[in-house]
Amino acid sequence: MFMGEHQHSIDPKGRLFIPARFREGLGNRFVLTKGLDGCLFAYPLPEWEALEQKLKSLPFTRGDARAFVRFFFSGAVECEADKQGRILIPLNLREYARLEKEAVIIGVSSRVEIWAKDQWEHYKGQAASSYEEIAEKIVDLNLGI
């Protein structure tokens, strides 16, 4: 399980240090792709494969399903950390997530998210203001929270 928040700089070559605890959970190789809300998602290979199976079952005749799967998989790349614990984030993914100099790496249960620092601060501020309201809606889903 991934949890926590870490801030790190992105070097001029587009490399980002991934905290050791996250690297251990992600494994030697993992998948990085375009996430939702303007961030990147990183999945351990077994989690990615399970997600891939679920997405394969979406009806390809539905335009919205095709569009989501196309966008999600076209941005995906397999990553491996170097000896210093850094990954190279491809330019297209850096542009998508507006990653320039500072990044925030967060653990979100089964995945890791990579955010541009300013985007994360903005998102976190908005989410904090509606945290209780969201919690009330989630309780209605009977998840036992």
Curated annotation (Swiss-Prot):
CDD domains: MraZ_C, MraZ_N. The keyword Repeat applies. It is found in: Cytoplasm, Nucleoid. Residues 5-47, 76-119 form the SpoVT-AbrB domain. Belongs to the MraZ family. Forms oligomers. This is Transcriptional regulator MraZ.
